[in-house]
Each structure stands twice: as structure tokens, then as C-alpha cells.
Amino acid sequence: MIKLKSYFGEFGGMYVPQILIPALTQLEEAFISAQDDAIFQKELKYLLNNYAGRPTPLTLCRNLTKGTRAKLYLKREDLLHGGSHKTNQVLGQALLAKRMSKTEIIAETGAGQHGVAVSIAASLLGLKCRIYMGSKDIKRQKLNVLRMQLMGTQVIPVHRGSETLKDACNEAMREWSKTYEYTHYMLGTAAGPHPFPTIVREFQRIIGKETYKQIQKYEQCLPDAIIACVGGGSNAIGIFSDFVDIPSVQLLGVEAGGLGINTEYHGAALQHGSIGIYFGMKTSILQSSEGQVKNSYSVSAGLDFPSVGPEHVYLKNTGRVQYVSINDIEAITAFKKLSIHEGIIPALESAHALAHALKIIQKQPDKAQILVVNLSGRGDKDISTVHNALQKERDK
């Protein structure tokens, strides 16, 4: 059988206990066979179009760029059913789970967006669902926890370590190693052991495909730059994929600068990490000189992750994608600006990408340029977080 490439340059691989190799091999084989299965592809397309709501619009921000020569477009993944880009790939993985005769789904979630998306797919396709979530994230994402529970999902709090996404990932992987015969581990980002980074990228590729067609329809040309936030990296790799081979389009990934990348409180694994083995892959990790994984930090739960998908490390090393960071205050400011001027409340994760786009425009307001920001999710889940952060600023 044809095999997928398990490495991106030197990054990626399958660094897992021997017991999980058969499950990962089965998943790879199911994915490869599904690519040539017209019935599978027809079902996935039907669900994406008629259930999830694809294609999503490409929206021009007329107010935010007033007084400049720039055009700023938003790829509106926030309008997808479930509220974020996560729905794209969970529908694909859920169909793969059915194809492999699995009866249960287990997954991890940080911001809760992936957990909600998994719950949607499991509910739709009649699969049992368990979601592991750091207890800190449960507190800051109560709305998404309730949404998951409403759909019949068992949300399991993780009290280990920093009680955030990395600990939820570890716990979900641990559980999968015990139950893989009847469960499918639905990883939420383009990271982890092979074949997950490739599978997730391919299911998220629809974002870039649509953007490519839409921007040419509206502008009769390609954009100058595409900007996306990067935690694990699935929304970014999804929109980047159809533009990677077009050097005229600048690709910009935006990491969580937290309280500042010169502090210990950030999530910038690409800019300040070092190479190691983590979560079943060779990648860039925030780690100590002794190899201990450090705690990451971000005001946005979805970017609060100490590592990143291996393809992003490869794209950074080859120079094809430039990675920058935006701090909490800049992200919250962009969150407010989009809400006030365009009537769109973005996820805090997406607000990091928006903040960098606004920086580019502010630096050269007289430059005629076309920027596309992947608005990966909506911000309902973040309203109380932003409210609390603004309250703290006022109380200083």
C-alpha cells in the first residue's frame, strides 16, 4: 500500500509506545483508501456544504482600513457550524472512525472549540464521546463546556501539570493507548505522531482552496500576504497549503506572545523553542536545558500550548513562512477593534493574526496591498476573558 510521508524534512515521525503503532497504521491505511473512495468523498463534501456551511465567505473589512490604501479580507471560519475551523477536519476524522468500525471518540481540547466540534461530529454520526480538558481551561471556557455536555459528551477535567492543553493531550493519548481497539483519538491540530499532521492538514486544506478562488474572483489577483494564528497550527496550515508553492504570496504565522516573549509567559514555540521529541513527534518545544517541557501561557486557551506541528517547523526552517508573535494586550486591542468597527467578534486566537495584519497596515498606510487574515473562530467563548482583562487594566 502507498504510504504517506511521515516527516517534513527532519520533523515529524511516530514517537509513540509500540502498542499504538497498529492503531496509527490502521488510521493511515483508512485515510489513504478514503482518498480514492468516491462514496466517502461525496459524504464528506455533503456534510461540509450542507451541514457545516461551506464555503465560508471572504469578507472585506471596509471600516478597519479607512484612510489607508490597504485591503483587508477575513476568511470567515467563524461562520462555520460550531464556530470555528475545527469542524472541517473533525467531520473527516469522524467518517474515518466509522470506516474503521470504532464506536467511541476521545479527544483533547484547550479553548473548547475542538471539543465542541468533536461533540458535533460524534453526535451527528452516533459515536460516544469523551473530551479531556485541563481544569484551568474548564474554568475559562465554561460556555464551551456546557455546549459539549448538551450534545452528550463526557467532559473529563485534567488536574495534572499546568492543567491546560498540553496535559489534556497527554491524558487523551494515555487513554487511547488503553482503548484503541474501539476508540478513535481525534487529535485537534496538525501535530502529534504521524499520520495526524498530514491528515489534519488535508482536511483543513479546504480553507486555502476556497480562499484561492475567492480572492481571485474579487481582486483578479492573489493577495500580498496571508496571516494566521499558530498554536498547534491547523488553521494556519489549512490556509497556507494552497499558497506554499506561490512565492509572491507572503505567509505569516502569528504565535502567542503572552506577557512578552522575553518573559517566561508566552506560547512562541517556533521563535523561542528548541528541537526535541514531544507528543509523539520531533518538533520545536518550549523546554528547559534539561529537556523538561515548560509551561506555556496565552490569554487565548487555544494558543496556550508549548509546542507546534512539525510542518510549521519545516516551513520556518526553509524560510517559506515567517513566524512572529503578538502579545495579550495587542490581541485584546484587535479583538475590540474588529468588534467595534466591523461588528464581528473574533476568537482571541484569531485576534492575534488580526493584530499583526493591522500592524502591517499601520506601518505603511499608503501602500496598496491585499492582506487575508484567517478568522479561525468566533469570540463568544472569550467575552468574559476579555471583560476580566479589561477590568484588571481599569483597576490598576
UniProtKB/Swiss-Prot annotation:
InterPro entries according to UniProt: Trp_synth_b_CS, Trp_synth_beta, Trp_synth_beta/beta-like, TrpB-like_PALP, TrpB-like_PALP_sf
Under Pfam families, the record lists: PALP (PF00291)
Cofactor(s) essential for the protein: pyridoxal 5'-phosphate
Q: Which UniProt keywords apply?
A: Amino-acid biosynthesis, Aromatic amino acid biosynthesis, Lyase, Pyridoxal phosphate, Tryptophan biosynthesis
Q: In which pathway does it act?
A: Amino-acid biosynthesis; L-tryptophan biosynthesis; L-tryptophan from chorismate: step 5/5
Enzyme nomenclature, EC number: 4.2.1.20
Q: Which SUPFAM superfamilies match?
A: Tryptophan synthase beta subunit-like PLP-dependent enzymes
Which GO terms of the cellular component aspect does the record hold? cytoplasm
Enzyme class, top EC level, equals lyase
Origin: domain of life:
Bacteria
Q: How does this protein assemble? A: Tetramer of two alpha and two beta chains.
| Job description of the protein | The beta subunit is responsible for the synthesis of L-tryptophan from indole and L-serine.
Name assigned to this protein: Tryptophan synthase beta chain
In its UniProt entry, the species of origin is given as Blochmanniella pennsylvanica (strain BPEN)
